[in-house]
């Protein structure tokens, strides 16, 4: 999408917005490294829309944490039936997801919580990784305990009616 933007559209990524206001159909934005005035703007803020004073009671950030195993050895892969790649997705938006990737890794996400996503410590991340290790062990008890290679967290935005917030 970025590569196909028309010439009259400018993209500002990783630009901390300090203040904005709208006056007579002109939007003024003050950033750390400069200012812009425009008639139209897209604030791509995910769960942080309310920090801009927009739709304060409509959405909030949810922290999701996922872990991925290292690639399974031939022996480990055979012990779980040598499956093709597969995935189980939840019926509910915040339910657990587990997948077997083409390169024999297991990806699991089974934590969704209201948590300040900018302040997760390494020990908190390790706690969540332990939950995911438990989820993998319940389904695949024959796999070793040290199988998780990486764990990460990110945010998604939830709105009161489970839809996106997009308007002029």
Which residues make up each language-model segment?
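Active-site substrate-recognition segment that forms the wall
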Residues: 19, 35-36, 43-75, 79-168
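Helical element adjacent to the flavin cofactor pocket in flavoenzyme catalytic cores
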Residues: 1-39
């Amino acid at each position: 999408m970025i590569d196909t933007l028309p010439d009259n559209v400018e993209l500002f990524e990783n630009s901390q917005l300090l203040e904005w206001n709208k006056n007579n159909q002109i939007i003024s934005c003050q950033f750390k490294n400069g200012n812009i005035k425009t008639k139209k703007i897209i604030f791509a803020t995910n769960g942080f829309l309310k920090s801009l004073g927009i739709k304060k009671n409509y959405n909030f950030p949810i922290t999701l944490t996922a872990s991925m195993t290292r690639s399974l050895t031939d022996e480990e892969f055979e012990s779980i039936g040598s499956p093709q790649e597969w995935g189980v997705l939840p019926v509910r938006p915040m339910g657990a997801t587990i997948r077997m990737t083409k390169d024999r890794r297991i990806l699991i996400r089974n934590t969704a919580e209201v948590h300040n996503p900018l302040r997760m410590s390494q020990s908190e991340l390790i706690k969540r990784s332990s939950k995911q290790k438990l989820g993998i062990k319940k389904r695949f008890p024959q796999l070793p305990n040290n199988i998780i290679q990486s764990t990460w967290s990110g945010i998604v935005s939830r709105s009161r009616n489970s839809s996106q917030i997009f308007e002029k």
